[in-house]
């Protein structure tokens, strides 16, 4: 366990003790709706990311045969989840309609990290190719898969620090274009993720420390290595905008499903949060489209609520979960982050409705509930947000939020973001299910 000698004041006053108890809780953001920072990315920046991903679709279809049927689009289904709602005993007459956003099924990388990771590597490839005269600004992006481009990219190294899924997305995309790729992985990273990267020719450097140490090691390598690009999960605008670009497609999916989003038909989006880049980007993109009619809540482990801690402490100085006596140890490897993104937390101070925490036992119970109700197999991190809708009616804080915003939950739409799982080996899924059933049996016997 790592601690720093530091006095931390959190709001409300009883929050520190509640966090240290490691009992799940819902924290509401008292600053939600405050003005965004003056340097916050605007709609134009999101539109630029959308345009980049669109013009690279033919390239993606050429690089990855599995994208042929989608013409190179990196998108996931929006799956109705009424059965899950019933499994969790949350009736539709008090909770509206439920959907699962299936980023666990995103092609190639199998997780939400494909959105930001692919976008950043594509932006880098465009920049290098244009700089060296291989690509015109309006040119066909399939030139980035040419022998000349690959030769140029081979002289460059893409470096990232990760607990797993971002490393997978960066490593796969970079190696597909011919870049040298190095992924620094924390002690939380699963062995199968390391093996999958190595099979792609990616160099994996393993660290005994946590996520922050892996990121720091990657940053140090990039600082000392010529022609290298560091993908900074803690502060990359390119990653952030790649995630934000997902909002427009979700809006189209909701419209296709007949779900309105307006003053009388609120949208609730529940997203697992690690360092904050992916959920923060999605929240930013959705707020740009729907404004006050969308309510975004993050899900964090009871041992690693880094965004909650940073926002509750204020933005004056960085505060980590170690500073409040937590150990950052969780089965949710993708969420095992001690310090929230310095890029994202100031934005979330304005945009985020709240954060709810989840125990490892709940992760597995929710993973099992999703599998029973829908047949979808998730990794533990991806199941973190499943309990989000229930907090709104089963907790005093949630009921207060609904009352203060004059929300009729019967008219609401809930999107639970499933962030990863389709690439998990079958034996790992069997282990998840077995552990979940054992926990359920133990709970029933107490």
From Swiss-Prot:
GO BP, sorted A to Z: D-serine catabolic process; isoleucine biosynthetic process
Catalytic activity of the protein: D-serine = pyruvate + NH4(+)
GO molecular function: D-serine ammonia-lyase activity; hydro-lyase activity; pyridoxal phosphate binding
Alphabetized UniProt keyword annotations: Lyase, Pyridoxal phosphate
Keyword Lyase: yes
Disulfide bond entries: none
EC number(s) from the headed UniProt entry: 4.3.1.18
Swiss-Prot/TrEMBL cofactor(s): pyridoxal 5'-phosphate
InterPro entries on file: D_Ser_am_lyase (IPR011780), Ser/Thr_Dehydratase (IPR050147), TrpB-like_PALP (IPR001926), TrpB-like_PALP_sf (IPR036052)
Residues with N6-(pyridoxal phosphate)lysine modification: 113
Family annotation (NCBIfam families): D_Ser_am_lyase, PRK02991.1
Protein family: Belongs to the serine/threonine dehydratase family. DsdA subfamily.
Name of protein: Probable D-serine dehydratase
Protein's organism: Burkholderia lata (strain ATCC 17760 / DSM 23089 / LMG 22485 / NCIMB 9086 / R18194 / 383)
Gene name in the database record: dsdA
């Amino acid at each position: 366990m790592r601690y720093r000698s530091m006095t931390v004041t959190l709001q409300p006053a009883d929050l520190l003790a509640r966090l240290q108890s490691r009992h799940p809780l819902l924290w509401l953001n008292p600053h939600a709706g405050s003005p965004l920072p003056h340097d916050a990315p605007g709609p134009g920046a999101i539109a630029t990311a959308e345009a980049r991903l669109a013009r690279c679709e033919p390239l993606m279809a050429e690089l990855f045969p599995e994208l042929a049927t989608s013409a190179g689009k990196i998108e996931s289904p929006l799956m109705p989840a009424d059965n899950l709602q019933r499994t969790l005993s949350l009736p539709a007459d008090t909770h509206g309609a439920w959907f699962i956003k299936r980023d666990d099924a995103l092609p190639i990388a199998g997780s939400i990290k494909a959105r930001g990771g692919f976008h950043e590597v594509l932006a880098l490839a465009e920049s290098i190719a244009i700089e060296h005269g291989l690509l015109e600004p309006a040119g066909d992006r399939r030139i980035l898969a040419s022998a000349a481009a690959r030769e140029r990219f081979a002289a460059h190294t893409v470096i990232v620090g990760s607990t797993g899924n971002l490393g997978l997305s960066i490593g796969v995309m970079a190696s597909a274009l011919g870049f040298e790729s190095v992924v620094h992985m924390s002690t939380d990273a699963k062995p199968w993720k390391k093996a999958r990267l190595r099979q792609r020719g990616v160099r994996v450097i393993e660290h005994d420390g946590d996520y922050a140490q892996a990121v720091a090691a990657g940053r140090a390598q990039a600082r000392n290595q010529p022609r290298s690009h560091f993908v900074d999960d803690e502060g990359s605008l390119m990653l952030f905008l790649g995630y934000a670009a997902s909002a427009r497609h979700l809006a189209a999916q909701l419209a296709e499903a007949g779900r309105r989003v307006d003053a009388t038909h609120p949208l609730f989006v529940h997203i697992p949060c690690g360092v904050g880049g992916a959920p923060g980007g999605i929240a930013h993109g959705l707020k740009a489209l729907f404004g006050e009619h969308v309510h975004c809540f993050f899900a964090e482990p009871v041992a690693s609520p880094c965004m909650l801690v940073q926002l509750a402490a204020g933005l004056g100085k960085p505060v980590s979960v170690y500073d409040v006596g937590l150990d950052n140890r969780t089965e949710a490897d993708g969420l095992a982050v001690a310090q929230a993104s310095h890029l994202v937390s100031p934005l979330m101070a304005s945009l985020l409705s709240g954060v709810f925490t989840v125990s490892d036992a709940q992760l597995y119970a929710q993973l099992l509930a999703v599998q029973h109700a829908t047949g979808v197999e998730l990794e533990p991190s991806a199941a973190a947000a499943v309990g989000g809708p229930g907090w709104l009616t089963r907790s005093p804080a949630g009921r207060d939020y609904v009352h203060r915003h004059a929300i009729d939950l019967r008219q609401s739409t809930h999107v639970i973001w499933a962030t990863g799982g389709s690439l998990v080996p079958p034996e790992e899924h069997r282990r998840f299910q077995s552990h979940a059933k054992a926990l359920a049996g133990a709970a029933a016997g107490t």
